[in-house]
Amino acid sequence: MNKSPTACDVKRLTIMLVAGIVLSQLGVSATATSENSAARDLAAAKSFAFGGVGVAGLMSEGERNLRAVVERPDASQQLQAAFAHATLAGELYILIGLRRCDRAAYQKIIGSLARPNDDVEVARGCMISREPFRQLLSQIHDGRFDDYLSRPSW
């Protein structure tokens, strides 16, 4: 026996369809927000650190955020957008990321970058110190941090 849909069935189907569309859009929005949060957090970095830091030798939050951004297909765009409002430590991370994923963008920024005399908080192993921004910038330009992102994360 064929049963034709009632008005109640059509209404329920319509509500489910609309709810599905809304939920799928929220999922896309939440994903985009979490992807952008890594770039935003990277730009806000208070200190600069690569490799194991602290007593436990853990990966720094900045390195973890940089790795998350660099893995994205739009990494260069995210890094360049984040650079505009980055702290000095954030700028260093972003330059390392651009050097890896978009050399042309890296060269463009490095060529026009103001080189302040300010110091940046740096963590190396268990030691926290302040180092000149210019010195760290020179190390980035010399490729001293290039291999860190090639290593597997732990």
Where are these regions (language model features)?
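Core register positions within helices of long alpha-helical scaffolds
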Residues: 65-68, 97-100, 129-143
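Short N-proximal segments of mature Sec-exported proteins
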Residues: 84-102
